[in-house]
Amino acid sequence: MQRLLELKKYAEDYIKEKSKFFDLKLSDGKIVVIPLKSLEEFKKEGEIMHHCVFSNEYFKKKDSLILSARIGSKRIETVEVNLKSFQIVQSRAVCNGTSEYHDRIIRLVEKNMSLIKKLTA
């Protein structure tokens, strides 16, 4: 019960802190990069991608924005952006690997970092 109450609070805090990014959508025509918008999305991302984005509670990191890079409905990589330095901390595919689109995803996010920066103001 205590854990559920904690998660509810984290969910509310996450929405309060990160909702300004929820309309963000970066695309190069094939790849689309969007923010994770809820703890449920973090959980699903972690399960599908077989990595620790949910279990290590990245939703609690105030200075991180977690993005999901996709082609259609298929998740390709999960991207962590530092909201203080506006640098990509990591971008991981299934099982913490890299995808064939890794460099393209990095370029897409870096190219649009000014947009992310503008949303933090």
Residues of each region from the PLM?
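Catalytic-core elements of nucleic-acid end-processing and repair enzymes
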Residues: 1-121
